[in-house]
């Protein structure tokens, strides 16, 4: 029976014959068909429904077949089949609701509702898709759904068993879902609730047996009460009347009393919740504001007249007024003329935010202020030197936060926080105190925890000035009061996450407290001590451990004496000091009762008495190196926060909404039960959040069924219609199972238009101004276009001109939203072709789909119009005269338009060249000049030149003769020559001389035929001289290889102009113009020597000059004789001079091997830099730089040992054993090579005894503190030249030589930390020294009995070296230092030596979190992030990492990629995150959901970038 597979090949066309549809019913009724083939057919059918329109004649058969499957197969036996058929049914309902809603007749709707609500397993994974399907039917026929649900509640049943009560419960839950859908879609959900309240009353009065089981009845009553209480708030007068009326209508007294008791318990529960919080928030906030008291301001600034508010009816008018009011802020510079205007405009802005728009339409208002850049422009006023203007701007931002609070996205809150933070350090105390006050009110006003604001507040503790650090202590206190776990659980009933964001940031809080309590300023210390006890109140275990282990006894005592009395903390003081009374005043400041909570003075103004041990102390800068290890759960960095912090979730930005969805999905998935179909279910109901809706990640189903992967996606894709996350508390409370996470309802299509009646649509479309309205209008337009495509020709046509102006505006603003429209024929026929071309380009539409209808021989005008439109677009882009409103749009997509249309034209001409269709070619041939000339004109713009020249070549092949004529007539010679060059590469028969001639290349004066022959020659001579001068200045001859053109022959003297390359102008030596060309001539360092054109009188005897080696002093003494050179203690490089001109190091004959002229020279031998002896340094070398040993040798030693780099003797390349332990091309090898002296055979200069004596002297000199660079060289040379030498080995191991050298090396590294700047030479040599010691350590380990494979001894020896190098890097101002490169190479060697382990990553993360110094260049942080990347690349270290470790790395890197403008941090952290993703993908238990959870701290676009980087590693 496998033949049915052939019946499904042609099912994408909506007009296909019924016989071509999926034979679902036939196959599933046939018992002989194996279940695997049935599931394969059903899988393909599901993919078809998700991606394409269905055959309308088969819709009823499809519904019958899918309902048959659920009734014929048991879920226990076929769980995969039942779930697959259910999801297919739900997608089919969504498809039919969109494509052909008339199919939903009354009988079918009732059957579907009965099946979706009652006949499926009582599991959430089925409930989720069922609600989505019911929603689709409800949007088509809401009244029918309401009537059926009400009828389900009306049906009496004499036998009220458990099944009956379950039916009622399922019906009630469905009603709740519908009300919730109406509420989310901004419909009148209360009206729908009132409709069903009548059914609730009838159910309780008539259909619920009062004598039945009380537990079952109570479940129904509680569910009804929860539904009503959920939408009818008890504090609303009208809602209270509805509740009272409902209770009065109940006839069964038992049920009435139950309802009344539920209402009372709900009120009591609410009041108990308010009283059970850890802190009295109102009182605590008063104390915080007293700490950050607003300075005494004038009445105009501090007070706000409630009557002064401005209301708007139109959002466009609001935006226009905002732009006008912000005009004075456009100028960066504040002038005498504009500052008063700025202040008055801020007051007007304050009136606007007090009006109706921010309250009634907060999301749209936020969008407007983003577009007009309100925050950026107001920030210019906050930094004004005029105090009144600055304070006015600050208070305006404060009121803006208070009015919008959680409606403001994190990006705007971040901007405002930074504005306030910058003013904390202001020299004007009134500005600083006002900014302090505004920062505290910012945290008080927001209701959601934002990790970015938490991190910014934490960084304030590192500021240099006192006020930011004091503010940081108060901000931490506000976070603890506002976002502690008790507040989180009480204010968010849906929250079940085991940890809060604040709890996951405990490591930051602890470091925060340690820095504040040990601060040098008393005000900061005292404020942080009070904050500590708020931390103790929230997390007593962590606070006790911190107090006992992280503070000195003095600081601990001072902290214990600062316990606020009003917190009622039960803490036993370790030992009460006799001076406790001295600090009691501080405690009394926080012991006021709530009746006397308003204090007249702030803590900043109190005169404080403190004991001697609490005097200002210096904060420790080294305690952070020993940060405690993190827990296995990875709670050091914040990982997740439940999306149910408040019922009024902020969804004003795509980022925040996606974050909420991801958190909800993670939260629900924590409770999932793993079963046999978990993998399939996840694939069906979930998609990767970072993937776009049309990605393959969203359409993938079970790995066993991938037969429909090749389905086309050019129609409306329903893949994501059933996969958006949501959470309903009633489902969690009343559903029996929690198998899979729930999902939120998609944005519905609002309204319904009858066919042919488009006036309402036109008005709704043109009036749409808010983003939500525009999105709804587009969805409705899409639906109407799909419906009208099936109408008869007599039906009214949709008039695109009625909405074209608005449609164009939306295209400019959101062109990607039109991708699904490009496959709708009605849309492509109604929209102008030039708009379509732009949409095709931006959405990367398939070229074949465009040309399928455009290259029809019967309609050649279609192709002609397409080419003309593209040419006009090129002209428009080249002219660059677009309207101001569209400039940004064309600037953004200009390159995209060019590249896409190049490829589109390439396909057109390629097809024309292959098919040779005369009809199409004739129409195109007339357009060839136009398209060719515009292509010539746009050369030089920003686009893909490979595609450009491929298109040029195809047009050239289309009609090469005509193309050559067009190109020859083109004016710009440079463009012409480049095109000719590319065509010459592609076509061997192409001749450049046919295109470029003298007349077309150089502009000459026209020849007068009346002139005499002598005049003509004179004119030619002038022209030729001009050309000659032009070529001499540039040294380039553009007319090479053009000997055939007689007009280019120079008539002066051909012999005077010769060139070895035909493109460089060469003068005769006697020519007076030679000096100009010699000065401007450019000679490559790899160019072969040319014969020396020296004159005879300037000749010098080469051999005689080679015999003498002149010193600089001998030249000054005019002595030509050789003198005996003396070797000083500190030798300097000697330079040998010669009378010959400088020569290139490599001789011509050396560059060509075996006489083969075509053989390419070795680039290594051609390099002018030679680290080792070079074989090519022959007698022609005239400049030699010598490096000699800094060793005091005897004259005999010098004569016998020293190496001379002389011209008459070739030196051998040295190779030492230790060199094999360094990378070949490393900077370490380069530096080492300059320390060595070898003779011509490469042997070492001295024996071990000589080296050892020098090394011993150097150790003593360095320890005494008086040494030079040569003494450091003495330490390094024996380690290199005597590597694996037995005497050296014995001394290092048996005589404690290794430890002695290591101590000296650490001493040298520490000496670099004593100065503000880095001594580069000492630092470089010190790193080379420890690098050599590391190589020796690895060698010595191999000689021991127990080889150190795990790097234990290496870590013990080089731990302090690593710390000193990090301290050194902290002083760097840039990355262009050789010390940084040497440190990188040393770090890589440590990596290979197993120095780094899993705990090393934890310490690095701790340093990155706690030791960030904003006033440095961040070189150290970049180095540490690079180290993490290296560790993640090491397989041995990666095996030690757990997911919690990877999560910590991801959370920390999220700050460095998003929370800073340092590009080096951004790049290196992005690479680390990409590597983390690769590591997670290689784990055995890898799942996309888990990865999304780990990366949910990143915005969607950043995560996409990380995925791209990871895929290209």
From Swiss-Prot:
Annotated region described as Disordered, given as residue ranges: 586-605, 648-701, 1089-1180
One GO MF term: kinetochore binding
Interaction with microtubules: region residues: 461-716
Gene3D superfamilies reported in the protein's UniProt record: Leucine-rich Repeat Variant (1.25.10.10)
Composition bias type Basic and acidic residues, residue spans: 1122-1133
Miscellaneous information on this protein: Present with 521 molecules/cell in log phase SD medium.
Name the record gives this protein: Protein STU1
Source organism of the structure: Saccharomyces cerevisiae (strain ATCC 204508 / S288c)
């Amino acid at each position: 029976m496998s033949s049915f597979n052939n019946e499904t090949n042609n099912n994408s066309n909506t007009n296909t014959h019924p016989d071509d549809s999926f034979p679902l019913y036939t196959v599933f009724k046939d018992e002989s068909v194996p279940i695997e083939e049935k599931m394969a057919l059903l899988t393909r059918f599901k993919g078809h429904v998700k991606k394409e329109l269905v055959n309308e004649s088969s819709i009823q058969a499809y519904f019958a077949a899918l309902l048959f499957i659920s009734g014929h197969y048991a879920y226990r036996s076929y769980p995969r089949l039942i779930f697959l058929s259910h999801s297919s049914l739900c997608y089919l309902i969504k498809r039919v609701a969109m494509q052909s809603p008339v199919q939903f007749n009354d009988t079918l709707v009732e059957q579907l509702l009965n099946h979706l609500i009652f006949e499926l397993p009582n599991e959430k994974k089925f409930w989720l898709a069922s609600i989505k399907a019911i929603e689709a039917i409800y949007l088509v026929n809401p009244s029918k759904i309401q009537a059926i649900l009400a009828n389900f509640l009306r049906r009496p049943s004499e036998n009220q068993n458990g099944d009956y009560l379950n039916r009622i419960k399922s019906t009630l839950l469905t009603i709740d879902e519908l009300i919730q859908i109406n509420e989310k879609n901004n419909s009148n959900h209360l009206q729908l609730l009132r409709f069903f309240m009548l059914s609730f009353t009838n159910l309780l009065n008539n259909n619920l047996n009062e004598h039945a089981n009380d537990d079952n009845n109570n479940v129904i009553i509680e569910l009804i009460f929860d539904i009503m209480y959920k939408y009818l708030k008890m504090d609303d007068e009208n809602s209270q009347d509805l509740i009272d009326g409902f209770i009065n209508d109940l006839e069964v007294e038992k049920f009435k009393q139950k309802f009344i008791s539920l209402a009372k318990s709900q009120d009591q529960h609410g009041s108990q919740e308010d009283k059970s919080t850890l802190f009295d928030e109102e009182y605590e906030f008063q104390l915080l504001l007293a700490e950050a008291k607003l300075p005494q301001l004038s009445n105009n600034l501090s007070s706000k007249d409630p009557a002064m508010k401005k209301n708007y009816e139109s959002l466009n008018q609001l935006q226009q007024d905002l732009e006008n009011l912000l005009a004075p802020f456009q100028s960066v510079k504040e002038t005498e003329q504009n500052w008063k205007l700025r202040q008055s405009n801020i007051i007007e802005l304050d009136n606007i935010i007090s009006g109706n728009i921010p309250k009634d339409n907060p999301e749209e208002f936020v969008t407007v202020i983003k577009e007009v850049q309100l925050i950026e422009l107001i920030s210019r006023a906050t930094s004004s030197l005029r105090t009144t203007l600055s304070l006015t701007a600050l208070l305006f931002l404060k009121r803006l936060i208070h009015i919008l609070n959680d409606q403001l996205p994190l990006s705007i809150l971040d901007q405002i926080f930074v504005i306030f933070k910058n003013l904390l350090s202001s020299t004007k105390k009134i500005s600083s105190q006002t900014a302090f006050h505004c920062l505290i009110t910012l945290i008080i006003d927001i209701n959601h925890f934002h990790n970015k604001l938490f991190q910014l507040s934490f960084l304030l503790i590192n500021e240099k000035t006192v006020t930011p650090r004091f503010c940081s202590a108060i901000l931490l206190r506000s976070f603890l009061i506002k976002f502690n776990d008790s507040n989180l659980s009480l204010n968010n009933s849906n929250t079940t996450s085991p940890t809060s964001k604040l709890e996951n940031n405990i490591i930051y809080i602890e470091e925060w407290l340690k820095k504040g309590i040990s601060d040098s300023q008393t005000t900061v210390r005292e404020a942080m001590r009070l904050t500590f006890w708020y931390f103790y109140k929230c997390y007593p275990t962590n606070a006790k451990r911190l107090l006992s282990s992280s503070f000195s006894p003095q600081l601990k005592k001072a902290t214990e004496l600062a316990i606020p009395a009003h917190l009622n903390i039960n803490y036993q003081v370790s030992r009460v000091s006799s001076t406790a009374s001295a600090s009691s005043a501080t405690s009394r400041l926080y012991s006021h009762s709530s009746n006397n909570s308003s204090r007249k003075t702030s803590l900043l103004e109190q005169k404080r008495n403190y004991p001697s041990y609490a005097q200002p102390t210096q904060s420790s800068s080294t305690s952070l190196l020993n940060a405690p290890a993190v827990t296995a759960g990875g709670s050091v960095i914040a990982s997740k926060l439940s999306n149910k912090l408040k019922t009024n979730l902020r969804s004003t930005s795509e980022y925040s909404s996606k974050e909420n969805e991801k958190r909800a999905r993670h939260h629900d998935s924590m409770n999932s039960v793993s079963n046999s179909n978990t993998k399939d279910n996840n694939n069906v109901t979930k998609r990767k959040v970072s993937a776009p809706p049309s990605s393959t990640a969203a359409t993938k189903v079970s790995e066993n069924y991938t037969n429909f992967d090749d389905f086309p996606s050019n129609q409306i894709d329903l893949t994501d219609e059933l996969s958006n996350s949501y959470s309903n508390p009633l489902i969690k409370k009343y559903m029996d199972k929690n198998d899979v996470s729930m999902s939120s309802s998609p944005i519905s299509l609002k309204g319904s238009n009858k066919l042919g009646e488009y006036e309402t649509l036109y008005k709704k479309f043109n009036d749409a101004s808010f983003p939500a309205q525009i999105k709804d209008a587009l969805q409705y337009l899409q639906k109407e276009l799909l419906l009208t495509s099936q109408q008869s020709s007599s039906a009214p046509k949709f008039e695109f001109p009625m909405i074209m102006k608005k449609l164009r505006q939306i295209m400019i603003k959101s062109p990607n939203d039109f991708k699904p429209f490009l496959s709708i024929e009605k849309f492509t026929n109604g929209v102008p072709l030039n708009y379509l071309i732009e949409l095709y380009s931006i959405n990367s539409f398939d070229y074949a789909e465009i040309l399928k209808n455009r290259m029809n021989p019967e309609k050649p005008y279609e192709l002609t119009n397409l080419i003309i439109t593209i040419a006009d677009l090129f002209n428009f882009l080249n002219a660059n005269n677009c309207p101001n409103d569209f400039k940004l749009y064309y600037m953004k997509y200009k390159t995209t338009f060019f590249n896409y249309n190049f490829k589109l034209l390439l396909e057109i001409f390629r097809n024309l060249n292959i098919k040779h269709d005369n009809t199409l070619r004739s129409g195109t041939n007339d357009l060839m000049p136009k398209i060719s000339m515009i292509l010539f004109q746009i050369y030089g713009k920003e686009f893909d030149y490979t595609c450009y020249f491929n298109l040029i070549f195809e047009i050239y092949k289309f009609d090469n003769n005509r193309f050559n004529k067009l190109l020859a007539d083109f004016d710009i010679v440079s463009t012409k020559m480049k095109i000719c060059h590319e065509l010459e590469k592609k076509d061997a028969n192409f001749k450049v001389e046919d295109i470029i001639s003298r007349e077309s290349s150089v502009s000459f004066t026209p020849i007068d035929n009346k002139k005499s022959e002598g005049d003509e020659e004179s004119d030619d001579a002038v022209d030729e001289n001009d050309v000659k001068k032009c070529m001499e200045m540039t040294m380039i001859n553009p007319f090479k290889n053009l000997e055939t053109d007689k007009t280019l022959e120079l008539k002066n003297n051909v012999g005077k102009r010769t060139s070895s390359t035909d493109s460089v102008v060469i003068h005769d030596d006697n020519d007076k113009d030679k000096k100009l060309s010699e000065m401007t001539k450019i000679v490559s360092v790899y160019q072969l020597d040319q014969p020396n054109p020296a004159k005879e009188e300037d000749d010098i005897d080469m051999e005689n000059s080679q015999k003498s080696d002149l010193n600089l002093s001998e030249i000054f003494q005019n002595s030509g004789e050789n003198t005996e050179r003396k070797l000083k203690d500190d030798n300097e490089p000697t330079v040998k001079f010669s009378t010959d001109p400088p020569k290139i190091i490599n001789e011509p004959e050396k560059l060509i091997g075996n006489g083969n002229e075509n053989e390419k020279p070795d680039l290594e031998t051609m390099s002018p830099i030679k680290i080792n002896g070079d074989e090519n340094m022959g007698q022609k070398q005239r400049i030699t730089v010598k490096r000699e040993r800094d060793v005091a040798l005897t004259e005999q030693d010098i004569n016998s040992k020293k190496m001379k780099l002389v011209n008459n003797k070739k030196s051998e390349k040295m190779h030492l054993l230790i060199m094999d332990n360094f990378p070949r091309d490393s900077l370490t090898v380069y530096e080492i090579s300059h320390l060595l002296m070898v003779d011509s055979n490469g042997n070492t200069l001295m024996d071990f005894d000589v080296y050892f004596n020098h090394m011993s002297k150097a150790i003593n000199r360095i320890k005494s503190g008086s040494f030079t660079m040569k003494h450091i060289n003495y330490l390094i040379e024996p380690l290199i030249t005597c590597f694996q030498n037995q005497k050296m080995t014995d001394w290092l191991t048996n005589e404690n030589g290794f430890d002695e050298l290591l101590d000296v090396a650490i001493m040298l590294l520490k000496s670099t930390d004593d100065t503000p700047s880095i001594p580069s030479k000492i630092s470089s040599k010190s790193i080379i020294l420890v690098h050599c010691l590391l190589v020796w350590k690895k060698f010595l380990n191999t000689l021991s009995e127990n080889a150190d494979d795990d790097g234990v001894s290496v870590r013990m020896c080089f731990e302090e070296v690593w710390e000193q190098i990090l301290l050194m890097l902290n002083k760097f101002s840039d990355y262009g230092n050789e010390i940084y490169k040497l440190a990188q190479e040393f770090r890589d060697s440590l990596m290979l030596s197993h120095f780094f382990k899993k705990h090393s990553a934890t310490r690095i993360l701790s340093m990155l979190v706690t030791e960030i110094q904003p006033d440095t260049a961040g070189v150290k942080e970049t180095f540490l992030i690079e180290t993490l990347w290296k560790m993640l690349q090491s397989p041995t270290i990666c095996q030690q990492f757990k997911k919690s470790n990877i999560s910590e790395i991801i959370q920390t890197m999220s700050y460095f990629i998003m929370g800073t403008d340092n590009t080096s941090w951004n790049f290196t952290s992005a690479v680390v995150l990409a590597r983390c993703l690769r590591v997670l993908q290689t784990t055995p238990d890898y799942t996309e959901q888990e990865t999304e959870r780990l990366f949910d701290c990143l915005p969607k676009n950043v995560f996409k970038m990380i995925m791209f980087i990871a895929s290209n590693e």
